[in-house]
Amino acid sequence: MQDECHNCATTAENAVEEIFKVMEMVMQHFRNMNPMVLFDMHKFHDKAFAKFMEHKNIFLLDVISTNLKRGVSEGYFRQDIKIDILAKFRLESMMLAFNMEAFPPVKYNAAEVTIIVIENFLYGLATASGFKLIEQYKAKKNTIHAQ
């Protein structure tokens, strides 16, 4: 997964495209993933869960922070955002799809929940030029998925 995240960042033309590449990666992973996996890992596999949390709190937090800084420097994300707070917010919001009380798997698709949360997060960061770029990537994504 680290290689995939790195690939998303290095092949993307900008911070917005990077997030859309990440969303596509998330869709691929979540298609074959049981939402119970984190619950079971936490309950039955302490060491594996601790390793996952370490990965989340160090690697993923850095990836998100770097993307936010990139978006600000490119002019697609607002200058006034608090990167440290929003990076942690984004990190924790990733876990929402696995909260079975909030989003029971019989009613909600984890990939869809994640994509909706990411898109709304992205709109909240965007400048006017960022908003236009988001709309372009969404239209492109919707065209590809409609085929």
Predicted regions, residues:
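All-alpha amphipathic helical-bundle segments outside canonical DNA-binding/catalytic cores
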Residues: 16-17, 55-56, 73-89, 107-116
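A short secondary-structure junction motif
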Residues: 29-34, 67, 71, 93, ...
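C-terminal peripheral helix-coil segments that are non-catalytic and often amphipathic
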Residues: 66-70, 74, 104-147
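Short, well-structured alpha-helical segments
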Residues: 20, 65-68, 83-91, 95
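Short secondary-structure transition hinges
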Residues: 31-65, 72-76, 80-85
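Hydrophobic/aromatic residues within well-ordered alpha-helical segments
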Residues: 1, 22, 26, 56-60, ...
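Secondary-structure edge/capping motif, primarily at the C-terminal ends of alpha-helices
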Residues: 5-8, 37-41, 101-104
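Hydrophobic alpha-helical connector segments
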Residues: 3-36, 87, 114
